[in-house]
């Protein structure tokens, strides 16, 4: 049952194992009965934080994917798999066992701005077709490297008995953790793949305040879904200037018209000198629009129908 009071906002969903991000969106859409989208795909074998936008919040998805992401990952040494995780077929093996010291020494080459080749089994498009579809058909997939950024990699433990290593990785968008495992294993000469992956955070979303799908359905049954929803402004971060407007200005902006920032609160014209974008809301937090700042005016680019 959908709560009549709930129309829009963000959810911090804890994606379960063996479920695709698209399937999570489908479950949430059924609960809320409105448009739903997610920010940042998680592989079916990964768990953890999946930000999900509900209703008008889908207009702010681009702002949610720009934040830093953190992952807890276990790499299994000794073999390379077709998917670079435990799901794929073994294509190479090695009897080498890397020491903790050798792993630490190799990590430096993967920190900072690096070039990374996405896994063959990925959503990257090749001639208009998803790479994983070609790979599943047995076609050879050659993907060009991408410029990505890994902020930090911490080696948490190295177990020579199980031949695994645990890492905490902080990175920007576009990084494939499976590619990191593959490339680190190759550099160590022992091969490697991801045997466990959990996303701990995406921007302001963290696993500590995430909600399971079962919990969402329980809240829906109790008609209190608003308890799980976060405001649209939750994903805005520091890149956008936040300003309050009165009812008159809000109506002008909602018609797609620009307004002078002198008409906003908090001396908007002065504050906007260091910003390219701004987020306008009514007093009380009701969202109005995301606007581009142009010559002292707010020009709407995303208007919220709430």
Curated annotation (Swiss-Prot):
Its EC number is 5.4.99.25. Responsible for synthesis of pseudouridine from uracil-55 in the psi GC loop of transfer RNAs. Keywords: Isomerase, tRNA processing. Transmembrane segments: none annotated. HAMAP family: TruB_bact (MF_01080). It comes from Anaplasma marginale (strain St. Maries). NCBIfam families: TruB. One of its GO terms (biological process) is mRNA pseudouridine synthesis. One of its GO terms (molecular function) is RNA binding. PANTHER family: PSEUDOURIDYLATE SYNTHASE TRUB1 (PTHR13767:SF2), TRNA-PSEUDOURIDINE SYNTHASE (PTHR13767). Belongs to the pseudouridine synthase TruB family. Type 1 subfamily. It catalyses: uridine(55) in tRNA = pseudouridine(55) in tRNA. The lineage of its organism: Bacteria, Pseudomonadati, Pseudomonadota, Alphaproteobacteria, Rickettsiales. It is an enzyme of class 5 (isomerase). The gene is truB. InterPro entries: PsdUridine_synth_cat_dom_sf (IPR020103), PsdUridine_synth_N (IPR002501), tRNA_psdUridine_synth_TruB (IPR014780), TruB_C (IPR032819). This is tRNA pseudouridine synthase B. The active site is at residue 43. It comes from the Bacteria.
């Amino acid at each position: 049952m959908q709560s009549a009071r709930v129309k829009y906002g963000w959810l911090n969903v804890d994606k379960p194992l063996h479920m695709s991000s698209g399937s999570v969106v489908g479950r949430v859409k059924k609960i809320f009965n409105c448009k739903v989208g997610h920010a940042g795909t998680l592989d079916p074998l990964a768990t953890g934080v999946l930000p999900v936008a509900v209703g008008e919040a889908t207009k702010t998805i681009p702002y949610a994917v720009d934040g830093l992401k953190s992952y807890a990952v276990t790499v299994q040494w000794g073999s390379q798999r077709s998917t670079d995780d435990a799901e794929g077929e073994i294509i190479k093996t090695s009897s080498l066992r890397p020491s903790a010291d050798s792993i630490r020494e190799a990590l430096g080459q993967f920190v900072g701005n690096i070039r990374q080749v996405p896994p063959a089994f990925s959503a990257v498009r090749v001639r208009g077709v998803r790479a994983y579809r070609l790979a599943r058909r047995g076609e050879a997939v050659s993907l060009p490297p991408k410029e990505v950024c890994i902020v930090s990699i911490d080696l948490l433990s190295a177990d020579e008995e199980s031949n695994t290593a645990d890492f905490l990785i902080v990175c920007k968008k576009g990084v494939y953790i499976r590619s990191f495992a593959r490339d680190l294993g190759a550099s160590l000469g022992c091969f490697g793949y991801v045997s466990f992956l959990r996303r701990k955070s995406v921007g302001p979303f963290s696993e500590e305040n995430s909600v399971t799908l079962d919990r969402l359905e329980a809240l829906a049954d109790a008609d209190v879904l608003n308890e799980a929803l976060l405001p649209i402004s939750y994903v805005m971060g520091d890149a956008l200037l936040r300003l309050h407007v009165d009812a008159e200005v809000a109506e002008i902006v909602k018609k797609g018209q620009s307004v002078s920032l002198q008409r906003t609160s908090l001396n908007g014209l002065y504050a906007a000198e260091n910003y390219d974008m701004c987020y306008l809301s009514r007093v009380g937090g009701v969202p109005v629009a995301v606007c581009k700042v142009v010559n002292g005016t707010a020009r709407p680019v995303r208007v919220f129908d709430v």
